[in-house]
């Protein structure tokens, strides 16, 4: 889903680097699964596909930060589905070793781009987008990794591991960004995961908490497709009214 704007904080650089380090460590889970075996089904991504995809969007975030630091126009990302298809196609013939190496390099590239930016640069309004410059990092860092770990484990039929990945994402996010709006976003994101899985009883407490922390999220939630699977539940209907 598109991500609602987060909120600027102090020591943004440190916080971003902490989430990136946590993500880099956790991504070893996918690296260990990455090999050159083809997918058993055309629509199912391999671990190699996931790694290549995640690396591409980290490089995109690094390019945005580098452009801001240099005073240049920032790259756009309007046709996300088209870009994703191109990335997947381009990586079909690459070896697992190549993809792993590129994924590791993308972490170093993004970390360097964060380090190069000043706090003022990170807190500037993002060109052509809502929110601040630094907000390009979480959706292309730990939040993105957690999402794809969930996709991977769901495809393997391991609901417990998929859920654990979402809890990890929430914990990393809340440890780094402790203001009410960011805490609300962490709760909302977890609630959306449960809602997409049709688990209304698990989703609703997190959605409710997100509204308590950041009431404006309710306007977003009213049209968020991630919640469509639970809207007819009486309790969900009540909190979304």
Which stretches of residues belong to each language-model region?
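Start-of-helix register in tetratricopeptide repeats
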Residues: 185, 219-220
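Short, contiguous alpha-helical
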Residues: 2-7, 35-82, 123-169
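"A position-specific structural signal for the A-helix of alpha-solenoid helical repeats
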Residues: 189, 223-226
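Acidic/histidine-rich alpha-helical segments that form the ligand environment
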Residues: 83-122, 135-136
């Amino acid at each position: 889903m598109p991500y609602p704007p987060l909120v600027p904080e102090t020591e943004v650089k440190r916080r971003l680097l902490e989430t990136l380090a946590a993500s880099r460590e956790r991504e070893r889970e996918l690296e260990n699964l990455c090999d050159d075996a083809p997918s058993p089904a055309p629509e199912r991504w391999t671990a190699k596909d996931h790694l290549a995809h995640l690396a591409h969007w980290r490089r995109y975030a690094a390019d945005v930060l580098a452009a801001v630091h240099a005073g240049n126009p920032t790259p756009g990302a309007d046709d996300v589905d088209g870009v994703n298809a191109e990335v997947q196609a381009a990586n079909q013939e690459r070896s697992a070793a190549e993809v792993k190496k590129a994924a590791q390099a993308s972490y170093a590239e993004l970390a360097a781009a964060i380090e190069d930016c000043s706090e003022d640069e990170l807190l500037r309004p993002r060109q052509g987008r809502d929110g601040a410059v630094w907000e390009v990092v979480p959706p292309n860092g730990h939040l993105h990794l957690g999402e794809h770990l969930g996709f991977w484990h769901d495809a393997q039929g391991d609901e417990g591991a998929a859920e654990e990945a979402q809890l990890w994402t929430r914990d990393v996010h809340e440890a780094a960004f402790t203001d009410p709006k960011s805490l609300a976003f962490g709760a909302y994101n977890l609630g959306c995961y449960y809602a997409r899985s049709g688990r209304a009883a698990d989703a609703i407490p997190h959605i409710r908490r997100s509204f308590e922390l950041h009431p404006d999220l309710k306007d977003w939630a009213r049209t968020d497709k991630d919640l469509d699977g639970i809207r007819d539940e009486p309790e969900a209907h009540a909190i979304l009214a």
